[in-house]
Amino acid sequence: MSGRLIGIARRDRTRAAMEVVDRGEISPGEGVRGDFRGALKPGRNKREVTVLAREDWDAAVELVGRPELEWWNRRANLLVEGMALPRTQGATIRLAGGAVLEVTGQTDPCFRMDEIVDGLQAALTPEWRGGVTTRVLAGGPIAVGDQVECGE
């Protein structure tokens, strides 16, 4: 199954504003270059890069009556569209520039989502709607518009 990368975001510290960029770099042990979370727990980080599907985000914000809410409020690193994200640990997500991500689990929505909109945490909870956490197996450049493929 393939789709397209339509958003890249990063933040340099916890609770910092998300910086949305058109291109970037993904590397093992660092995640999305410039994002603080990817570099936590070197060699043991199961959350180097987080990926969110546009269709899942749209369903969640529709449920809370805020369809205009921007995706980066979810605090994910990558936004893809046109594909269902794998829901199996060990599945891979491959980006056109050569980066390969291994799914380590679902991104559990936290209480901070309700700080944005009441009910958003619950709207993101079912069916892995909050996205997936990944570990970087291979790095590479990324850019909005890149093709993305999933494998089990």
Model feature map: region roles:
Residues M1-E152:
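Metal-cofactor-dependent catalytic cores
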